[in-house]
Amino acid sequence: MGDAVISERLLQGVAVVTGATQGLGKSLALELAGLGVTVAAIGRDEAGLRRVAAEATGGRVHPVVLDVGEIGAVPQAFAGIARELGPVTLLINNAAVYPRRDFLEEDPQDFMATVAINLGGVVACSHAALMEMVETGFGRILNVSTFADVLPVPASAGYSASKGAGRVLTRALVADIGDRFPDIVISEWMPGILATRMGKPEGLPALDAAAWGARLALWHDRSLNGRTFVLDRELLEPRSLKRRLLDKLRRRSPVARRL
C-alpha cells in the first residue's frame, strides 16, 4: 500500500478532467468515475466524449464540449458545470497538444496556438475552478506535466516552452494563494511516457498511469501543496550541502511518498 489517503469529500464532489476524449484524460475520467466521483469530462470532440460517458460506471461521466484554448469560453463552461452537477472540488489539468514542428519553419501564430492550449487552458481552467473553491476554502488541483522543459527534443519548442511554463505556474499558484487557502491543494504529476497518441507504443498503458493519477488527485493533504510526483512517487527537492550534512548527523534522510 502507498501513502495516499483518499479524501471522502473529494469522492463525493465534482471533478473536472480536461482533455478527456482519449488517452490519459479518458482513463482518468473513467478511473475517477469507477471510484464514485461525478466527473465533468472536457474535450473538443462531442462524439468522443459521449463514447467515454457510455463506458463510465453508473453514468458518472458528463460530457462538456470545450476547447480550453478558447480562454473566454472557459468561465461559462465551468458555470454550467456548477449549475448542473455542483461546485467543482477537483480539477485535473490534462489537456495538451504536441505538434512536431521545426521552430524555423513554424509560424509564430501556430506556436502561440500551442501555448494557448497547453498553458492558457491551465490558467483559464484553474482560475475558473479556484473562483468556486475559494468560496468554501477547499479544493484540489492536479496539473499533468512532463520533463519537456528540462529535456526538450527537436521540433517541440512550443510544447516544451508551454509545459515548462505550466510547471512554474503550479508553484506560482501555491505561492499566491497557499497561505490564504491552505486547504486548496495544488500539485504536479508527471505520468511519464505513455502508450497514447502523444506518447510511444512501448510506453506505460494509460489505464495503469490513471490509477496513480486518480489516487494523487483524490489525496488531499496540505503537505502536497507545490509538490511534484513522477509516476507513482514523490520527486524530492534537491537538498543543500548544509541540509545533507545535518541529515547525515541526525541519521535521517528524506523518504519519497508513494501512491
Language-model-detected regions and their locations in the chain:
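Conserved glycine-rich cofactor-binding loop
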Residues: T21-Q22
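Conserved glycine-rich Rossmann-like NAD(P)H-binding loop of the short-chain dehydrogenase/reductase
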Residues: L35-R51
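The beta1-alpha1 cofactor-binding region of Rossmann-like NAD(H)/NADP(H)-dependent oxidoreductases
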Residues: A47, V65-Q76, P108
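Substrate-binding pocket helix/loop in short-chain dehydrogenase/reductase
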Residues: D102-F103, D110-M112
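Active-site helix of classical SDR
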Residues: S126, S162
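Residue(s) in the substrate-gating loop at a strand-loop-helix junction
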Residues: T146
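C-terminal helical subdomain
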Residues: R180, I184, E188-W189, T196, ...
